[in-house]
Structures are given as C-alpha cells and as structure tokens.
Amino acid sequence: MEINKLNARILSKFGESGAVFGVGALELVKDYPELLILSADMSMVAGLERFKNTYPDHFFNTGIAEQNLIGMSAGLVSENRKVVVVAQACFISMRSFEQIRQYCGYMKFPLIIVGINAGFSLTFMGNTHYAIEDMGIIRCIPGMTIISPSDAGQALKAFYASWTLNKPVYIRFTGGLNCPVIYEQEFNYQIGKGIRLREGNQIQIIATGSMVDRALKAAKILEEKGISVDVVDMHTIKPLDTDILKKDVKLVVSVEEHSIIGGLG
C-alpha cells in the first residue's frame, strides 16, 4: 500500500495494531497461505477480529499464557509455517524472555513478535501494564531486530518489511486508536535506516515511536524561537542507524516512551 493523505488518516483511526492486523495481515495471507497468527487473548484489542473471522484456520488464541504462546509458535515455525505472535508488550517481553532467548536468539527461528500497548499506553491499568523496559530486555538477545514505528502507516510498512526479513523481529506498538499521522505521503522505509523529518544545525532530536510526534511539535516551538532543529525518526532500535546521527550540532536529545537504559537513549 502506498501512503497518501487519505489512507494515512484512515490507518490512524485503526491505530498501529489495527492497521497491521486489520489491513496488512488480511492482504499477506492471500499470497502467503503459510501465515499464522497466534495471540494471547488479544484479538479484540489488537484489531484481529476480522482476520480471525475471515481466516479461522490461520488464527489461534493461546489464552493469557505468553510462554506457551512462544513455545507453540516456535513449534509451528519448525514445521515451515510463518508465525506472527501478538501479546501485550509488557508481558511478552518479561514473561517470555527465556523462550524468546532460546528459540529466536539461539535457534534463530524467524518469529515476528508484536508487542501492543507499549510504553505508557495502559496507564489506567496501573504499573503492572507499563512497558518501558521491553526493548532493553529483548535487545540483548542475539540476532533480534527491534522496530518502534512512529505512526500507523509506518507500522504497516514495518510489518511488510519484517515479513521478508526472515529473521526474528520484535515490533512494539505505542498508543491506541486515532494515533497522530507522521507520514501523509509515500516514503521510503527500510529496516535499520532512520528517517530525517526536519533539517537543522543547532539541536538534533532523535525520537522513536509515539514520541516522534512530540519531537516534531517541540521542534516547531524551538524554530519559532530562532533555534534550528534536526528531527530524526529512529524507527529501528536494533540495528541502530549510526550514520544518520553523524551531524555537527550543539546538542543531541533522545526522546522515547521507554527507559533510556537499553532503549534509544
């Protein structure tokens, strides 16, 4: 799908997970019958209801049992199925660490693990549902790619790109429905290559996920005060694009909905 102003706003209403599973997965399964989606009781929350009802043989709900979810998914991958795993970011990263470490880090099974409601998306449920350590936890596992999309359109592109990568990937989604639109026209997306959204020579703001929108708003305020700001959308946390950071500025600021330890910062 090419991004334009109209579909960018439609995808925004779905949210990142809704765009991926309500649009992307429905398209992929037509060409890739080996696609399976396993969920820890997240079909409604993740926007999977349409996929589940349309392709019931391609969807399995393991219940709220994240360790079992990864184990079952790994078994299916060993039988040449392509598996997408969906669960809350806080639980899939912490409860399933040993299983992800074993099957993705050491056995190199190319699971696509999607952690929804990352960051502070579920603050109303208390700190048990915060996910501000998930990238740091998974980042230390060998061979993992970590992606943090900034809007729903980019989430869709990240999902498609992960599909062809044939490596274990963790994609974290922050925010919910009606997420801010960063990209209103088609753009080049490549895993491991950050995107410069604004050119500047005094301050560089490097942001990821939901904080990209905040970074752009901050840059606009600073520009009005005569301060030149460079803004980078660092959608891939691992591998990190160090080339885009090579800019002569006076101050570099990182912004993320995650601990700076093990995250972008």
Identify the residue ranges that each predicted region occupies:
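Thiamine diphosphate
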Residues: 1-172, 177, 188, ...
